[in-house]
């Protein structure tokens, strides 16, 4: 998979979660912050990243940098996805179903951020199992990675799109 150059895209950032993490040492607790950020151009490109630092803004900056390195392309048909798919990560699972125009994004918290920034405006989703933000984001990305356009599937099978769709 080729890397996507973040400088050529107009990316929008969304902070999904900020977590205060404590390391207990002899003198007390050492506090740090971890941030989970999703970036996307609302036109088929989306990425996520995590960052850790002593201060919240610095953690967010690191997360945005990381997210720009992990961009991926999402196949979009009209305003939705080409087919139903199930994404897994750890104990988290998400079902993504295409929806008719005008339905909107029906998704919970972290998954909604990913889908909206990917540019999908009509989709149904259901998250099952772990609902930790990082697990939901990674499961959503797993689902989006599995998506294929009809043209790609037809090419792999050596058929035309018409033959494939019957």
From Swiss-Prot:
Kindly state which keywords UniProt assigns to this record, in alphabetical order.
Ribonucleoprotein, Ribosomal protein, RNA-binding, rRNA-binding
- List the InterPro entries: Ribosomal_Su5_D2-typ_SF, Ribosomal_uS5, Ribosomal_uS5_bac-type, Ribosomal_uS5_C, Ribosomal_uS5_N, Ribosomal_uS5_N_CS, Ribsml_uS5_D2-typ_fold_subgr
A Pfam entry, by short name = Ribosomal_S5_C
Identify the domain of life. Bacteria
Q: Which residues form a coiled coil?
A: none
NCBIfam families named in the record = rpsE_bact
Q: What is this protein called?
A: Small ribosomal subunit protein uS5
> What organism is the protein native to?
Geobacillus thermodenitrificans (strain NG80-2)
């Amino acid at each position: 998979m080729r890397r996507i150059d973040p400088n050529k895209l107009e990316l929008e950032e969304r902070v999904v979660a900020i977590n205060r993490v404590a390391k207990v040492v002899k003198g007390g607790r050492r506090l740090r912050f971890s941030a989970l950020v999703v970036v996307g151009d609302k036109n088929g490109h989306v990425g996520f990243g995590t960052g850790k630092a002593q201060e919240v803004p610095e953690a967010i900056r690191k997360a945005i940098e990381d997210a720009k390195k992990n961009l991926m392309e999402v196949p979009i048909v009209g305003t939705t996805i080409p087919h139903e798919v199930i994404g897994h990560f750890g104990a988290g699972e998400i079902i993504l179903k295409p929806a008719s125009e005008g339905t909107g994004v029906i998704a919970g918290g972290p998954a909604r951020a990913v889908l909206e920034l990917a540019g999908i405006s009509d989709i149904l989703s259901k998250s099952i199992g772990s609902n930790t933000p990082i697990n939901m984001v990674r499961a959503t990305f797993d689902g989006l990675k599995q998506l294929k356009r009809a043209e790609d599937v037809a090419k792999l099978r050596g058929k035309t799109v018409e033959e494939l769709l019957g």
